[in-house]
């Protein structure tokens, strides 16, 4: 028996809301799916699109271990000692702009391990 999609669509068009509701329930039970799954996936996709994909890493304070923080800033930025010291001395300063979430978190961990206070924006 071949499926005739046009006939199926015609039958669906003629069905009442109650009949369509029963059809959906029967399909859900037969195939182990839910009609709510596509709606939830669409909502999750909307949230993912709204999530930030780039972060600015801001050094808010150097803390007590300023020399260690300067070393980490030099490593991250590639700047010389004088420039890295100026960045640390002038905190709050943006260390890295447009970093991915993983990169931003890695930089934050390094700076915090050196004793700095860091925020991601």
From Swiss-Prot:
**Pfam families, alphabetized:** Ribosomal_L12, Ribosomal_L12_N
Q: Name one GO molecular function term.
A: structural constituent of ribosome
Entry keywords, A to Z = Ribonucleoprotein, Ribosomal protein
**Keyword Transferase on this protein?**
no
Q: Its function?
A: Forms part of the ribosomal stalk which helps the ribosome interact with GTP-bound translation factors. Is thus essential for accurate translation.
Q: How does it assemble?
A: Homodimer. Part of the ribosomal stalk of the 50S ribosomal subunit. Forms a multimeric L10(L12)X complex, where L10 forms an elongated spine to which 2 to 4 L12 dimers bind in a sequential fashion. Binds GTP-bound translation factors.
What name does UniProt use for this protein?
Large ribosomal subunit protein bL12
Q: Which organism is it from?
A: Streptococcus agalactiae serotype V (strain ATCC BAA-611 / 2603 V/R)
């Amino acid at each position: 028996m071949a499926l005739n999609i046009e006939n199926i669509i015609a039958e669906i068009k003629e069905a009442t809301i109650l009949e369509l509701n029963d059809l959906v329930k029967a399909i859900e039970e037969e195939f182990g799916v839910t009609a709510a799954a596509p709606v939830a996936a669409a909502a999750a996709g909307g949230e993912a699109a709204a999530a930030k994909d780039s972060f600015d890493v801001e050094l808010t304070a150097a803390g007590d271990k300023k020399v260690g923080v300067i070393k980490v800033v030099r490593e991250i930025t590639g700047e010389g000692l004088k420039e890295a010291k100026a960045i640390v001395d002038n905190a709050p300063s943006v260390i890295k702009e447009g970093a991915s979430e993983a990169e931003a978190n890695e930089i934050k961990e390094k700076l915090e391990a050196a004793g700095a206070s860091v925020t991601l924006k």
